[in-house]
A protein has these predicted regions:
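Surface-exposed loop/turn motifs in large extracellular/passenger domains
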Residues: 1-143
């Protein structure tokens, strides 16, 4: 049986960003390296930013030899955009200030599931979900 982590970010009918992952929900920006991380943890989050290892992968960080095999689920997304903020390694990647988020030799063998299915495409979310940005600058590199 697999271990699990679950986070609910809804209170009094208001939804907030969930930021939950099997290892870390929110990692800070700039120059951190996460190397040789393996997890078999099921992760459930209520609204968005739900990943097998990290809820959000911030700009300037590098992820090397990371793998996740647990199931990842968003169970109360408010809309299609929130439902697509799910990923096998990171729920979203934050591109800001023209910097790069890099994933090298990372893999996911679990399943992705969200409460909204119509109009939601998770086929490219095995490493990370969609970009979350206020400026639209920055890059995602997956090797």
């Amino acid at each position: 049986e697999t271990s699990f982590v679950s986070a609910n970010s809804c209170e009094n009918g208001v939804s907030y960003r969930t930021y939950v992952g099997g290892v870390c929900g929110f990692n800070g920006e700039g120059g951190h390296s996460f190397t040789d991380i393996t997890s078999n943890i099921d992760v459930k989050g209520s609204t968005c930013d739900v990943g097998g290892l990290f809820g959000i992968a911030h700009y300037g960080n590098n992820f090397v030899n990371c793998s996740s095999s647990g199931d990842v689920e968003i169970y109360a997304a408010d809309d299609i955009d929130s439902a697509e903020e799910i990923g096998g390694i990171a729920g979203v990647w934050h591109n800001e200030n023209g910097t790069t988020v890099t994933f090298t030799n990372c893999s996911f063998t679990g399943t992705l599931k969200t409460n909204i299915t119509e109009g939601v495409d998770l086929s490219n979310n095995t490493i990370t979900g969609k970009a979350y940005s206020s400026t639209g600058t920055g890059n995602l590199i997956i090797k």
